[in-house]
Amino acid sequence: MRINPTTSGSGVSTLEKKTLGRIVQIIGPVLDVAFPPGKMPNIYNALVVKGRDTVGQQINVTCEVQQLLGNNRVRAVAMSATDGLMRGMEVIDTGAPLSVPVGGATLGRIFNVLGEPVDNLGPVDTRTTSPIHRSAPAFIQLDTKLSIFETGIKVVDLLAPYRRGGKIGLFGGAGVGKTVLIMELINNIAKAHGGVSVFGGVGERTREGNDLYMEMKESGVINEQNIAESKVALVHGQMNEPPGARMRVGLTALTMAEYFRDVNEQDVLLFIDNIFRFVQAGSEVSALLGRMPSAVGYQPTLSTEMGSLQERITSTKEGSITSIQAVYVPADDLTDPAPATTFAHLDATTVLSRGLAAKGIYPAVDPLDSTSTMLQPRIVGEEHYEIAQRVKQTSQRYKELQDIIAILGLDELSEEDRLTVARARKIERFLSQPFFVAEVFTGSPGKYVGLAETIRGFQLILSGELDGLPEQAFYLVGNIDEATAKAMNLEVESTLKK
């Protein structure tokens, strides 16, 4: 682990040897800077512009070198707004990539892309910093242990279980519940999980970031009385930030997580919401730099950029990073290059379906589209594997019969198919679950369901023991005992109405 104590976001001016350049062109967030011959900065070096604008306001803008243009000029992308910058202003080459604070000092705090705290709780100890650009761990350092990460969410644990130290993607279009699901996972895992978590808010809504912060303070994940005892560090580069900041904020969060893994030898949870915005910001920067766009207007370096980020998220012999990433799917098209490129890196995919969300089934996880490399008998056990396959087969058969039902009605089906449909509808409803983080909206208390309870519940539905219960009894409940209790209550209510 290379620690660089000389440069952090705000402390870059402490460098003794400064190379000065001058701005020669400004196009939005992109600056062209001229340097003296033989004093050219390297690619990814941090540049700092300091001075005053026309009304005397202090300016302090950090940029990152992206291209060497020739004629002693470089092209750099700004990490903050370029308002007030003028041609001829002095630019300092820090001589190193952007570095951010790492270690225990980051816990309980909110940072921007430069590693500067934005929570008004005072400065952060920056004695230990680390550059945001580094290579992925060598092949020989990797760890290949296989174990399941229990989430307490029935549909996930049964049909697409998560791997400890793996990469998980939550795929879905706009408004199907990706952020709510990621917040529930933080609630269930970060609280039960003894290690630390890092949350990277990449190009998402500022309101959601604020809600998450307030919720973490209420739940004790962030300890206001003693910040040092907090379990999470937050790094935000939201929708209103320039593309340079949104493109690099994921690396800032990852750098903090890597320190906990490599130096503190801890198991870390890394949440990224939303990895699509990382690609989107890269596409904007690519266009600003004048590169020819590739498929669907994305940057030609899409696979390289995604690979350089994802390959650093891995488990080594020192510790593990388990990463849970929300992936926005443009126009619900899973073949779009951004989600399609992300698919290749993941151990498990949780696909959210607009059809299920429209039916009011939350979490709206599609049981047939969601996959996991962990769903193998030798890893999860024969019973779990068999129940999961039977649930999928029943759901698949129901899907095939839906056209016939829509045209001819249920009565035209065979007795066997009618039974399959009845069980599939119970399964569909039993895959829904009340969330802790949605209590405020729904009014029903959240439920955590252990894996053994989940398997038992679906075993009873598939065996036919619960064929007599109404399907609404299975909707938004925790374990199967709650479903049978709800069925009894429904029966009592209907008797009283008569």
From Swiss-Prot:
Keywords: ATP synthesis, ATP-binding, CF(1), Chloroplast, Hydrogen ion transport, Ion transport, Membrane, Nucleotide-binding, Plastid, Thylakoid, Translocase, Transport. It is an enzyme of class 7 (translocase). This is ATP synthase subunit beta, chloroplastic. It catalyses: ATP + H2O + 4 H(+)(in) = ADP + phosphate + 5 H(+)(out). Belongs to the ATPase alpha/beta chains family. Produces ATP from ADP in the presence of a proton gradient across the membrane. The catalytic sites are hosted primarily by the beta subunits. It comes from Calycanthus floridus (Eastern sweetshrub). HAMAP family: ATP_synth_beta_bact (MF_01347). One of its GO terms (molecular function) is proton-transporting ATP synthase activity, rotational mechanism. ATP binds at residues 172-179. GO terms for biological process: proton motive force-driven mitochondrial ATP synthesis. Its EC number is 7.1.2.2. F-type ATPases have 2 components, CF(1) - the catalytic core - and CF(0) - the membrane proton channel. CF(1) has five subunits: alpha(3), beta(3), gamma(1), delta(1), epsilon(1). CF(0) has four main subunits: a(1), b(1), b'(1) and c(9-12). Pfam families: ATP-synt_ab (PF00006), ATP-synt_ab_N (PF02874), ATP-synt_VA_C (PF22919). One of its GO terms (cellular component) is chloroplast thylakoid membrane. It is a peripheral membrane protein. It is found in: Plastid, Chloroplast thylakoid membrane.
